[in-house]
């Protein structure tokens, strides 16, 4: 499939092939990563990348949009069907762009927002001082209970009463437990706040009924379209009639220009795939695998924040091992096991070191792995973290990982990337 690229730019072609090899021979345990289908990749690699289409279907600023109109309309309809909403905007280039559009539509600079602390599992776009959200708005934070590691809803409610925020965000990037959207809406209503649910990590679980839905609770919902949803990298906004017009205008012309029609086509394909019964089976297996992996890690003597997981990810507290998250990530990389360093609640380490690692099961579940493989993966992780500097041991494990991966190849579409 790369014959034209090899002829034009062999350096890039070689790097792509090497990345494909890395994905085939290693275990991808980064909670935000997954493998798309060949159908999604074909849509993204199509002639749609050539087409400008500013505006919405039927209301474009360019001619020649009859076919991209049909594609975007399908993406909108499938997204609404998948999540049970009346309106969707499929144009955001990313989850961050979706959040920017929501904030600029619903807030004025200086308005007060209440978001989850980044080191407690929140996200940069929910008020971090290094992000636009922390620079433009008056931000206050809630977090998790120190004993349980779960969201402290009583403290959240107390803070909301004290500061009377314009917007409360319920969204996470490293939180392993179920989010109580109904309780969040109750708190928001009590103080007259709007509720935004950022379900970027759990969208696939929500769509499949494996996590409670924010629909009917949140005033607006944002998400990415990859991660557990297994689509192309991009963003999505879901909403009802009350905010549809202003949110659509906030995406275009408010914060973006021309939409990426090839990515929107990929989103439409992915939404269609997620509407099939087998996607529900896939999402259920993600959670079963996560529970099995969490149990295996705890059996290795490792500590998990909150003591386990209800969704697709878990957060390992490494302080008892003497390793930082960065050190653990490097050692696991050498063993062909990919994770990411991640802050734990009230982490004493700086962001580039951290005291934890985040682990997720969406990608290995796509490969067809199940609970027995999770037990083996947990054993490998435990061994690596016990002997992080034993190069011979790490090389042996990398070989064993490659052997396992041969029995559970990445989707056939990925293999075809080799040509």
Swiss-Prot record:
Residues carrying the site annotation Plays an important role in substrate specificity: 226
Modified sites of kind N6-(pyridoxal phosphate)lysine: 227
Enzyme class: transferase
Sorted UniProt keywords: Amino-acid biosynthesis, Cytoplasm, One-carbon metabolism, Pyridoxal phosphate, Transferase
Compartment annotation: Cytoplasm
EC number(s) given by UniProt: 2.1.2.1
Cofactor: pyridoxal 5'-phosphate
Pfam families: SHMT
Keyword Cytoplasm annotated: yes
Reactions the enzyme catalyzes: (6R)-5,10-methylene-5,6,7,8-tetrahydrofolate + glycine + H2O = (6S)-5,6,7,8-tetrahydrofolate + L-serine
Pathway(s) where this gene product acts: One-carbon metabolism; tetrahydrofolate interconversion; Amino-acid biosynthesis; glycine biosynthesis; glycine from L-serine: step 1/1
Keyword Amino-acid biosynthesis annotated: yes
Main location: cytoplasm
Annotated residues for binding of (6S)-5,6,7,8-tetrahydrofolate: 118, 122-124
GO cellular component, one term: cytoplasm
GO MF, one example: pyridoxal phosphate binding
Biological processes, Gene Ontology terms: glycine biosynthetic process from serine; tetrahydrofolate interconversion; tetrahydrofolate metabolic process
HAMAP family found in the cross-reference section: SHMT
Function recorded in the entry: Catalyzes the reversible interconversion of serine and glycine with tetrahydrofolate (THF) serving as the one-carbon carrier. This reaction serves as the major source of one-carbon groups required for the biosynthesis of purines, thymidylate, methionine, and other important biomolecules. Also exhibits THF-independent aldolase activity toward beta-hydroxyamino acids, producing glycine and aldehydes, via a retro-aldol mechanism.
Family assignment from sequence similarity: Belongs to the SHMT family.
Subunit relationships: Homodimer.
Stored PANTHER family: SERINE HYDROXYMETHYLTRANSFERASE, SERINE HYDROXYMETHYLTRANSFERASE 1
UniProt-recorded name of the protein: Serine hydroxymethyltransferase
Species name: Chloroflexus aurantiacus (strain ATCC 29366 / DSM 635 / J-10-fl)
């Amino acid at each position: 499939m790369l014959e034209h690229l090899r002829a034009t730019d062999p350096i890039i072609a070689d790097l792509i092939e090497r990345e494909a090899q890395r994905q085939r021979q290693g275990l991808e345990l980064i909670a935000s990563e997954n493998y798309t289908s060949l159908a999604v990749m074909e849509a993204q690699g199509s002639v749609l990348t050539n087409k400008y289409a500013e505006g919405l279907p039927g209301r474009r600023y360019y001619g020649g949009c009859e076919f991209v109109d049909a594609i975007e309309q399908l993406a909108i309809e499938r997204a609404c069907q998948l999540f049970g909403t009346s309106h969707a905007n499929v144009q955001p280039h990313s989850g961050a762009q979706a959040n920017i559009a929501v904030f600029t539509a619903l807030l004025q600079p200086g308005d007060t927002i209440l978001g989850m602390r980044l080191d407690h599992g929140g996200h940069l776009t929910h008020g971090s001082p290094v992000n636009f959200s922390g620079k433009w708005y008056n931000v206050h934070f809630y977090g998790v209970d120190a004993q349980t590691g779960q969201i402290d809803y009583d403290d959240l409610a107390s803070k909301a009463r004290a500061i009377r925020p314009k917007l409360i965000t319920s969204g996470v990037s490293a939180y392993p437990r179920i989010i109580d959207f109904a309780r969040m809406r109750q708190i928001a209503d009590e103080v007259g706040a709007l509720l935004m649910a950022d379900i970027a990590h759990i969208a696939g679980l929500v769509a499949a009924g494996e996590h409670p839905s924010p629909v009917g609770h949140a005033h607006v919902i944002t998400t990415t379209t990859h991660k557990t949803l297994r689509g192309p990298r991009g963003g999505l906004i879901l909403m009802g009639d009350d905010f549809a017009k202003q949110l659509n205008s906030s995406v275009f012309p408010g914060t973006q220009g021309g939409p990426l029609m090839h990515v929107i086509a990929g989103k439409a394909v992915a939404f269609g795939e997620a509407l099939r019964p087998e996607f529900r089976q896939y999402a259920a297996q993600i959670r079963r695998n996560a529970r099995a992996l969490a149990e295996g890690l705890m059996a290795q003597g490792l500590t998990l924040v909150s003591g386990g997981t209800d969704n697709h990810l878990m957060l390992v507290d490494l302080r008892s091992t003497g390793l930082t998250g960065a050190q653990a990530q490097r050692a696991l990389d050498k063993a062909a096991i990919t994770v990411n360093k991640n802050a734990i609640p009230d982490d004493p380490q700086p962001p580039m070191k951290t005291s934890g690692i985040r682990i997720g099961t969406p990608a290995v579940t796509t490969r067809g792995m199940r609970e027995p493989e999770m037990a083996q993966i947990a054993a490998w992780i435990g061994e690596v973290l016990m002997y992080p500097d034993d190069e011979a041991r790490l090389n042996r494990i990398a070989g064993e990982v490659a052997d396992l991966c041969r029995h559970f190849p990445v989707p056939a579409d990925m293999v075809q990337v080799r040509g």
